[in-house]
């Protein structure tokens, strides 16, 4: 079977934004104009196609990235048909992981901003993630029909807050209730959309007289941005003072794909204006899979290899999302980077070292699916039948093994105890939690060894709330949850050269004998636990060294101060002794545990607490109180900025333990007018009085 759409006509894009910037509505409109949705789904009524989980429709926020395919020939059907795969990404801070995993598999992103609220804290987080994966992007300023809408202020904010280089390609005609359309700076014509056909029809007309000068000024900036793409265009521009439409498009496309600039559009998705022009821009300026560098990975000998977006190459893909579907079971969403995958093929997972067979392949339109017999380079689809794949793993041709760069997932910062409301549901709850943890690598489940309680850990209170909610809806398990607990860590500050651990049991018959000497030193932050074998002359026999490492890995799960996991320590095994008869693996494992604990006690152990980047947006009258309150929570205020629509944005770094219940306090302090967002920043040493309180509460 040959390819239905040439690969150069593919666009894999994400639509990404702050909560309430109107991202889901924008996606809905895209699906409407591209002809797959005949009745527009409104988020206001909780009926949007992309928000397909019940909780999303209830809360009006998008949680999971649904992947959808649609086709577009341009607003005036003058372009060849392009296939656009859209991944809708959530805008809530607790779901940053979702954004991160979708950025990894996208070729381009469309950033949606609110014309009133402008660039919000979450927009900055998403922008940083797009920078990390070098994703080219364009911007769409939505809600131009709202009171206080200001397109040009958002342009300035993008430069200021995101250090972006936006290039407006259109300017708005009017604003608020007088917003009627846009001036297309490429054609220097006004575009007015017809309201009766929900924006399906439009007309080009002359630019309103009062906007002619402004349009010329912005066109000049756009042409200049295009000219900077090459010496050839720059020379022509300097000589003739202008460029043709084709030259401008080429220049803007080249610089957008190189992430040097971001074309900028505006409109009102709710009023069916402007989204159509932005769709054209996706085709004109976003890269196809062959416009971006080949994907990098390692072969089975760990030598670097690349895979081109080409059907002739061997198959390679990345599983970027798992979803449990009530009808077909587990769906594994994959982005194909190279080659072809047919229904019934076997694929190899190099991380698990396992071969699995693909049952069926489905392509999604939001929550509707269509079965396909094969997928090719550049495609995004869901596979049915894979039992043992976790998010972020590679799937490849068993005869040409490649391991693509893995995604890095953040460690959870908050823990809660959870138990089923009825004892009979215990097993059911276990299955549900395992399934959910497989889908979302930033969510973990473990059993507390002392209390036997089930603990769930995630990125924030809302994250865990939604997990508990999903257990109830999807698996029929109702659960009670304990108070949220902070995920503290322990580490050391000093080096101990000779930490000795001995495990000797010799009282007639076969005994036990293990003896190790360890050097224990602080490791770089974020480096984790590192084990080095520096044994010379066989003082500890080879076969016992894995047991020593196993002992260390066991010991680090519970630190010496308060039993929290130990991080960022380097352990070197450099001496020891053994007994011909009595030594065994268990003895060396125990010796390593004792040695490590002994060493940590002498190495100035400290407790680390998670610090959160908090941003509060408040009317000016309450700014003083907000800052005072953050300081009383051991917060460090790092700055205050003026916001677009008035008010102040206060940035601070605050320990997570001080932030529980903050939303209630903030609401009463500001009469419900201030809002805040927070995300995990890093771990830092807890002050002495805090550490003592933590240790005392753990000792109870």
UniProtKB/Swiss-Prot annotation:
One of its GO terms (biological process) is ribosome disassembly. SUPFAM superfamilies: EF-G C-terminal domain-like, P-loop containing nucleoside triphosphate hydrolases, Ribosomal protein S5 domain 2-like, Translation proteins. It is found in: Cytoplasm. Signal peptide: none annotated. GO terms for cellular component: cytoplasm. Residues 8-290 form the tr-type G domain. GTP binds at residues 17-24, 88-92, 142-145. GO terms for molecular function: GTP binding; GTPase activity; guanosine tetraphosphate binding; translation elongation factor activity. Pfam families: EFG_C, EFG_III, EFG_IV, GTP_EFTU, GTP_EFTU_D2. Its main location: cytoplasm. Keywords: Cytoplasm, Elongation factor, GTP-binding, Nucleotide-binding, Protein biosynthesis. NCBIfam families: EF-G (TIGR00484), PRK12740.1-5 (NF009381), small_GTP (TIGR00231). Catalyzes the GTP-dependent ribosomal translocation step during translation elongation. During this step, the ribosome changes from the pre-translocational (PRE) to the post-translocational (POST) state as the newly formed A-site-bound peptidyl-tRNA and P-site-bound deacylated tRNA move to the P and E sites, respectively. Catalyzes the coordinated movement of the two tRNA molecules, the mRNA and conformational changes in the ribosome. Belongs to the TRAFAC class translation factor GTPase superfamily. Classic translation factor GTPase family. EF-G/EF-2 subfamily. This is Elongation factor G 1. It comes from Polaromonas sp. (strain JS666 / ATCC BAA-500).
């Amino acid at each position: 079977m040959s390819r239905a759409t040439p690969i150069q006509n593919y666009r894999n894009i994400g639509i990404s934004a702050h909560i309430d910037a109107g991202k889901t509505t924008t996606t809905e409109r895209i699906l409407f104009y591209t002809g797959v949705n005949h009745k527009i789904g409104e988020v206001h009524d909780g009926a949007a196609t992309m928000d397909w989980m019940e909780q999303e429709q209830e809360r009006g926020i998008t949680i999971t990235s649904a992947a959808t395919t649609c086709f577009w020939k341009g607003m005036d059907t003058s372009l060849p048909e392009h296939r656009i795969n859209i991944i809708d990404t959530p805008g809530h801070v607790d779901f940053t992981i979702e954004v991160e995993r979708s950025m990894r598999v996208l070729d381009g992103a469309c950033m949606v901003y609110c014309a009133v609220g402008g660039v919000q804290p979450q927009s900055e987080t998403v922008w940083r993630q797009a920078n990390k994966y070098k994703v080219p992007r364009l911007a769409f300023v939505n809600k131009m029909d709202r009171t206080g809408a200001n397109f040009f202020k958002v342009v300035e904010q993008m430069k200021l807050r995101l250090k972006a280089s936006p290039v407006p390609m259109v300017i708005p005609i009017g604003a608020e209730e007088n917003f009627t359309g846009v001036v297309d700076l490429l054609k220097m014509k006004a575009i007015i959309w017809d309201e009766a056909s929900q924006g399906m029809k439009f007309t080009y007309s002359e630019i309103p007289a009062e906007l002619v000068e402004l349009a010329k000024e912005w066109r000049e900036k756009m042409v200049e941005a295009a000219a900077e793409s090459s010496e050839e265009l720059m020379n022509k521009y300097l000589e003739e003072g202008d460029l043709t439409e084709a030259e401008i498009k080429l220049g803007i496309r080249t610089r957008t794909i190189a992430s040097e600039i971001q074309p900028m559009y505006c409109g009102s998705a709710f009023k069916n204006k402007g989204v159509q022009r932005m769709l054209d821009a996706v085709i004109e300026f976003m890269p196809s899979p062959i416009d971006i560098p080949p994907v990098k990975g390692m072969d089975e000998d760990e030598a670097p290899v690349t895979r081109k977006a080409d059907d002739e190459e061997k198959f390679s893909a990345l599983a970027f999302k798992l979803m449990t579907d009530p009808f077909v079971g587990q769906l594994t969403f994959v982005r194909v980077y190279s080659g072809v995958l047919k229904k019934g093929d076997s694929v190899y997972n190099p991380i698990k070292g396992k071969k699995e067979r693909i049952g069926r392949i489905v392509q999604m339109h939001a929550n509707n699916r269509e079965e396909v017999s094969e997928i090719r380079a550049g495609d995004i689809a869901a596979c049915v039948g894979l039992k043992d794949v976790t998010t972020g793993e590679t799937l490849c041709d068993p005869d040409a093994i490649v391991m693509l760069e893995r995604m890095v997932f953040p460690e959870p910062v908050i823990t809660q105890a959870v138990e089923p409301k009825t004892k009979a549901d215990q097993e059911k709850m276990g299955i549900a939690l395992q399934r959910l943890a497989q889908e979302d690598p930033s969510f973990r489940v473990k059993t507390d060894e002392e209390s036997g309680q089930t603990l769930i850990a995630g990125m924030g209170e809302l994250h865990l709330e939604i997990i508990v909610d999903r257990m109830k809806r999807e698996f029929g398990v109702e659960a009670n949850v304990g108070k949220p607990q902070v995920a503290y860590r322990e580490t050391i500050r000093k080096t101990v050269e000779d930490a000795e651990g001995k495990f000797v049991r010799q009282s007639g018959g076969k005994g036990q004998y293990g003896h190790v000497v360890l050097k224990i030193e602080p490791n770089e932050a974020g480096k984790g636990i590192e084990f080095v074998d520096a044994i010379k002359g066989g003082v500890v026999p080879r076969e016992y060294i894995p047991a020593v490492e196993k002992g260390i890995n066991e010991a680090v799960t519970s630190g010496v101060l308060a039993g929290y996991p130990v991080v960022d320590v380097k352990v070197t095994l450099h001496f020891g002794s053994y007994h011909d008869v009595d030594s065994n693996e268990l003895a060396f494992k125990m010796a390593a545990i004792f040695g490590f604990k002994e060493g940590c006690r002498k190495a100035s152990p400290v407790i680390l607490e998670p610090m959160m980047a908090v941003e509060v947006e408040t009317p000016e009258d309450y700014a003083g109180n907000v800052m005072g309150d953050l300081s009383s929570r051991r917060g460090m205020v790092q700055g205050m900025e003026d916001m677009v629509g008035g008010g102040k944005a206060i940035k601070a770094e605050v320990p997570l333990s001080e932030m529980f219940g903050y939303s209630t306090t903030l609401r009463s302090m500001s009469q419900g007018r201030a809002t805040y967002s927070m995300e995990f920043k890093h771990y830092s040493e807890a002050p002495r009085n805090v550490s003592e309180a933590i240790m005392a509460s753990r000792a109870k």
